[in-house]
Amino acid sequence: MKTQFAIFLITLVLFQMFSQSDAIFKAIWSGIKSLFGKRGLSDLDDLDESFDGEVSQADIDFLKELMQ
């Protein structure tokens, strides 16, 4: 009975390790595909649009109001 229980626990641990490693490999592979795919490269350009280098007078006034 002890041997069967030990084999059961070892099998359970091995199945758990296999399922977690499969999920990790899928996440790594999807990350690689998103970096080199056309959609992945176009999605990286969205960050450039979020930064606006120009600061308007309204922005300066708002910052001055916050600092008071």
Swiss-Prot record:
Residues 1-23 form the signal peptide. Residues 40-68 form a propeptide. It is found in: Secreted; Target cell membrane. One of its GO terms (biological process) is killing of cells of another organism. Keywords: Amidation, Antibiotic, Antimicrobial, Antiviral protein, Cleavage on pair of basic residues, Cytolysis, Membrane, Secreted, Signal, Target cell membrane, Target membrane, Toxin. The modification Phenylalanine amide is found at F36. Its main location: secreted. Expressed by the venom gland. One of its GO terms (cellular component) is extracellular region. GO terms for molecular function: toxin activity. Belongs to the non-disulfide-bridged peptide (NDBP) superfamily. Short antimicrobial peptide (group 4) family. Amphipathic peptide which inhibits the growth of Gram-positive bacteria. This peptide has a significant inhibitory effect on hepatitis C virus (HCV) infection (IC(50)=7.62 ug/ml). Furthermore, this peptide potently inhibits HCV before viral entry into cells and kills HCV rapidly in vitro. This is Peptide Hp1090. It comes from Heterometrus petersii (Asian forest scorpion).
